């Protein structure tokens, strides 16, 4: 304690405030008028006594620290403060020297009982008549017993409760106090909006089972504890929280999370062990920073009824009125009555369930019980008071769940001002911010009566995660409602897309505003300087022969020009050509120079492009052998230089990871017998994956190199179950690529084959004779069981990785693909199944992998969308305009509506056109001046009717259209064969099969023709075959 320094200036300033209110009592301090002294005593620490009391708050307010077992006695005239405490505390308090007319007396309480009693009797003897105290705080301890005994022994003393006057003194905050409370409020709102909301949505969306208490603990850990520090990734989302002292931060109480029909709106409520459930979810949390408290409470509505949305909107209106009424001079009871009367006018049912108070004053004491915003409190509000405003209704009957009730709550920390209250914990109050729609509820709401008149929703777009399950609902609309529902969905998509495109343009202009007029807003190309030889003496002796000399060590070519040896670095040479003439050979060396039509993606920068350049130089010689040798040497040197530069650029983004820290004191969690892809040595190697302190490690069984992946470098973590696959996968997508062997990779996955490949070699006759054999049925059951066990094993391990990463303050969540939203396409060279996840579009079943992060996508353009074509293409333009767009070709047109609906639900801007565009030319134009591009309309040109300008390919189709017919007709994948008979399928519904189906003879003839065509084309798998079929299919 010797390093503790008390702030004397703050103590005397605030003590003077107490004496000033005491000497000139009025209003709330009127009770001090006849009092000669005030005794404030803090007893021994006790868990049973509330931690937030006026005694503790007063000590912290004056001294900055809590001093247990300490008595403070204020005497009015002359102004004097007497402290009675132990010797160690007395040394600290003696730092306060008398100042500003306030005398300080420090009495040391002896450990001897008799001496301690005499000291206390001496202090009590100085008291006369009435003295103020805080009896409701109920302190305990030896010091308290000695004090009570001494007071009782003096019969002429009368105790007066001064809770209200002390509350009034503490209520009005100065500038430093307000600054601290605002920081506390920012901490609370940041953890509520940026962590709890998204975490809760993720749990509900995925159907994860997690108790209220467990979720509250996750929230509480974000502030840090003794084992680990604060989650800076979360707090850095609010720039104003970058440099605060988290050691001075703590939760006022463990966050209170309630759902499932059990709600308690009292201050004493706590989270229970029930699992978080959809419906109405209440969340309350408060953070204390440098002893000042703040609080925030929100209601989240999961698939609410129209009535619940209306009720919540009503509460928002009442909240707005309450904020206007909470101003300097207003009486607390009048505010409550006005708000209650307003609610009664709007909705009498809600008024009957309205809470008995609107909140309370807060500060160093979390809840000032002497200042409640209720109908009985006639105290006036003062400027710069800070309140917790709570608008809530309790125990409303739930129409959807008979016998159950629900509650609605909005709670904020507010500051009183001249013209109303200012909300310090603003955010996440609008209906669109708190509503999350689930699939089941939307299915129930699809009724003929409603569908006849499309629902108009003027609220902004729902959060992205709220629509994961709702993207395919239109395919489930039955009968006469199908067309109407599809039309309604199209209208919603159109409205949302107009908003997204407007926002995209506005953000683009703002993003590139600082670079207006500049070129591409990126770093200018650096001119590289090469120095072959610093001094003439370094030239090789061979140049004395005045012949062309290739110096491989210096990466230079020395040319004899006018009798001088002139060296040229290989980077300045573009290429070399040779021409044979009868008995001569001409060697022509072409140099790099500006203005050439090189057809390269990057032009070589020059210091002065306007200078005079030598384009080429020619040498003619009869020594053909020497000239050929020089030609080959220059060519080889150029190839080596180009290769080195290519490798350098390719490895420029590869990072050197930090060292993996292995867990100590226990064995790491292990997933055994898995295969990595790509392999560490380019070969298939099995081994184990281990979870360590700051990352995961693949430890091979053989001599191959181990693979370390740090949590800090993991961008996405995917788990793909074995459904319709032969393997189960844990896939890691990295932020920056790493080296595996001699190749770089941004994706590493660990998989295990579901079962060894087995073949039934039984003849056809025997198979028909034993159809339904019990052995085969048992084998299928075992296979399903084995798949389920393997899926659970990998999923649990992925969850362990997520937990370990979150323990190291990394925001990492396991993402599982939605197979029902999947579609086929060609991201590379073959048709594969592409599966959406919560945040990405992926293909990870086989190499090469495809992982597209939707948050990094600027716009998605759909190409070749026109009547008569079976396929369309999709182009992802990334926010990093320097990166080339990602193409996915040959997507069956049957998936067009679902793809649009999925992208729209993820708030991704979409455009479409009838032809393929020349994207290299488009991106070159965009990068030349991004600000001008966005200022002139940005990507709006894509949303027009489209034209043939910039078209690279004709309307017949993209590279893989020739293969797609064969794929559609003869592919034997599980996905295609099953989807043809699904009742929900867009391409072949039950109605279409019954109304327009062909007979078996016709189907058999078509299958025979397809087989013959398949054999003729040799399967149609290679690129060459595909091109041949494409060419032959044109008419």
From Swiss-Prot:
Component of the FACT complex, a general chromatin factor that acts to reorganize nucleosomes. The FACT complex is involved in multiple processes that require DNA as a template such as mRNA elongation, DNA replication and DNA repair. During transcription elongation the FACT complex acts as a histone chaperone that both destabilizes and restores nucleosomal structure. This is FACT complex subunit SPT16. Residues 949-985, 993-1002 have a biased composition (Acidic residues). Forms a stable heterodimer with POB3. The SPT16-POB3 dimer weakly associates with multiple molecules of NHP6 to form the FACT complex. Residues 440-471, 944-1035 are annotated as: Disordered. The gene is SPT16. Keywords: Chromosome, Coiled coil, DNA damage, DNA repair, DNA replication, Nucleus, Transcription, Transcription regulation. The keyword Transcription regulation applies. The keyword DNA damage applies. Belongs to the peptidase M24 family. SPT16 subfamily. Signal peptide: none annotated. Pfam families: FACT-Spt16_Nlob (PF14826), Peptidase_M24 (PF00557), PH_SPT16 (PF24824), Rttp106-like_middle (PF08512), SPT16 (PF08644), SPT16_C (PF21091). GO terms for biological process: constitutive heterochromatin formation; DNA repair; DNA-templated DNA replication; nucleosome assembly; positive regulation of RNA polymerase II transcription preinitiation complex assembly; regulation of sister chromatid cohesion; transcription elongation by RNA polymerase II.
């Amino acid at each position: 304690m010797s390093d503790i320094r008390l702030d004397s200036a703050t103590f005397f300033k605030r003590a003077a405030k107490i004496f000033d209110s005491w000497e000139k009592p009025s209003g709330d301090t009127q009770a001090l008028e006849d009092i000669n002294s005030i005794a404030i005593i803090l007893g021994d620490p006790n868990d049973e006594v509330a931690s937030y009391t006026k005694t503790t708050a007063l000590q912290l307010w004056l001294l900055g620290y809590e001093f247990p077992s300490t008595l403070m006695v204020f005497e009015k005239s002359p102004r004097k403060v007497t402290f009675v405490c132990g010797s160690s505390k007395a040394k600290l308090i003696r730092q306060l020297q008398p100042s500003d007319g306030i005398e300080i007396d420090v009495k040391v309480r002896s450990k001897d009982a008799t001496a301690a009693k005499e000291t206390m009797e001496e202090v009590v003897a100085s008291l006369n008549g009435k003295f103020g105290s805080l009896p409701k705080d109920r302190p305990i301890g030896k010091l308290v017993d000695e004090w009570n005994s001494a007071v009782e022994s003096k019969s002429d003393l009368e105790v007066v409760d001064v809770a209200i006057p002390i509350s009034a003194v503490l209520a009005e905050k100065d500038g430093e106090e307000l600054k601290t409370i605002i920081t506390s409020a920012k901490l609370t709102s940041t953890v509520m909006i940026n962590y709890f909301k998204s975490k809760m949505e993720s749990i509900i969306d995925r159907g994860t089972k997690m108790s209220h208490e467990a979720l509250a603990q996750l929230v509480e850990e974000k502030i840090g504890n003794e084992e680990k520090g604060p989650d800076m990734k979360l707090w850095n989302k609010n720039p104003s929280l970058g440099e605060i002292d988290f050691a001075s931060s703590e939760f006022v109480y463990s966050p209170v999370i309630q759902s499932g029909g059990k709600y308690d709106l009292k201050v004493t409520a706590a989270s229970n062990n029930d699992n978080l459930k959809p419906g109405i979810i209440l969340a309350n949390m408060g953070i204390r920073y440098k002893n000042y408290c703040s609080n925030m409470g929100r209601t989240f509505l999961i698939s609410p009824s129209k009535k619940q949305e209306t009720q919540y909107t009503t509460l928002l209106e009442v909240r707005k009125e309450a904020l206007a009424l909470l101003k300097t001079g207003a009486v607390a009871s009048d505010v409550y009555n006005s708000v209650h009367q307003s609610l009664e006018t709007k909705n009498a049912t809600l008024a009957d369930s309205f809470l008995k108070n609107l909140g309370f004053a807060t500060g160093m004491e979390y809840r000032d019980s002497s200042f409640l915003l209720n109908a009985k409190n006639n105290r006036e509000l003062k400027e710069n008071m800070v309140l917790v405003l709570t608008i809530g209704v309790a125990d409303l009957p739930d129409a959807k769940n008979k016998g159950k009730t629900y509650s609605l709550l909005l709670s904020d920390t507010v500051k009183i001002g001249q013209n109303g209250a200012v909300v310090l914990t603003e955010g996440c109050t609008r209906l669109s911010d708190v509503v999350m729609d689930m699939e089941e509820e939307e299915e129930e709401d699809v009724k003929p009566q409603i569908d006849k008149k499309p629902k108009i929703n003027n609220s902004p777009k729902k959060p992205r995660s709220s629509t994961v399950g709702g993207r395919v609902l239109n395919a489930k609309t039955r009968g006469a409602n199908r067309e109407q529902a599809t039309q309604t969905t199209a209208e919603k998509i159109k409205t949302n897309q107009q908003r997204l495109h407007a926002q995209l343009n506005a953000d683009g202009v703002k993003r590139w505003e600082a670079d207006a007029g500049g070129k591409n807003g990126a770093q200018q190309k650096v001119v590289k300087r090469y120095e072959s030889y610093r001094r003439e003496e370094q030239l090789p002796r061979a140049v004395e022969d005045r012949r062309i000399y290739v110096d491989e060590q210096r990466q230079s070519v020395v040319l004899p020009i006018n009798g001088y040896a002139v060296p040229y670095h290989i980077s300045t040479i573009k290429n070399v050509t040779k021409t044979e003439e009868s008995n001569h050979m001409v060697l022509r060396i072409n140099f790099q120079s500006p203005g050439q039509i090189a057809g390269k993606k990057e032009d070589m920068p020059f210091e002065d492009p306007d200078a005079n350049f030598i384009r080429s130089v020619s040498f003619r010689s009869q020594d053909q052998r020497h000239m050929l040798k020089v030609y080959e040497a220059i060519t080889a040197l150029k190839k080596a230089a180009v290769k080195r530069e290519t490798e350098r650029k390719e490895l420029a983004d590869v990072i050197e990871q930090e060292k993996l820290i292995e867990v100590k004191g226990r064995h790491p969690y292990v997933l055994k017998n898995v295969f990595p892809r790509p392999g560490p040595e380019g070969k298939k190697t099995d081994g184990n994956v281990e979870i360590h302190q700051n990352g995961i490690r693949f430890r091979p069984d053989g001599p191959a190199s181990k693979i370390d992946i740090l949590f800090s470098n993991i961008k996405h973590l995917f788990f793909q179950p074995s459904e319709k696959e032969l393997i189960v996968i844990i896939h890691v997508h990295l932020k920056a690529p790493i080296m595996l062997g001699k190749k770089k990779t941004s994706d590493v996955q660990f998989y295990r084959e579901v079962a060894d490949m087995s073949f039934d070699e039984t003849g056809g006759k025997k198979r028909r004779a034993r159809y339904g054999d019990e052995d085969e049925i048992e084998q299928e059951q075992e296979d399903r069981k084995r798949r389920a066990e393997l899926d659970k094993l990998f999923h649990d391990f992925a969850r362990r990785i997520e937990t370990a990463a979150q323990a190291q303050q990394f925001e990492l969540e396991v993402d599982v693909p939605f197979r029902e939203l999947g579609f086929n396409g060609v991201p590379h060279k073959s048709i594969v199944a592409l599966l959406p996840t919560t945040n990405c579009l992926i293909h990870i079943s086989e190499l090469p992998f495809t992982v597209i992060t939707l948050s990094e996508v600027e716009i998605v353009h759909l190409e070749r969308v026109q009547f008569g074509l079976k396929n369309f293409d999709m182009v992802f333009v990334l926010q990093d305009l320097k990166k080339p767009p990602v193409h996915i070709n040959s997507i069956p047109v049957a998936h067009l509506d679902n793809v649009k609906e999925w992208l729209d639900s993820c708030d991704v801007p979409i455009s479409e056109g009838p032809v393929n565009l020349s994207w290299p030319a488009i991106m070159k134009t965009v990068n030349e001046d991004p600000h001008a591009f966005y200022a002139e309309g940005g990507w709006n040109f894509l949303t027009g009717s489209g034209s043939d300008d910039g078209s690279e390919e004709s309307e017949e189709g993209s590279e893989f259209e020739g293969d797609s017919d064969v794929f559609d007709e003869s592919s034997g994948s599980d996905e295609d064969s099953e989807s043809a008979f699904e009742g929900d399928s867009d391409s072949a519904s039950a109605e279409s099969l019954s109304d327009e189906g062909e007979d078996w003879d016709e189907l058999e003839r078509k299958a025979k023709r397809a087989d013959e065509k398949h054999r003729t084309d040799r399967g149609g798998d290679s690129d060459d075959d595909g091109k041949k079929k494409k060419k032959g299919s044109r008419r």
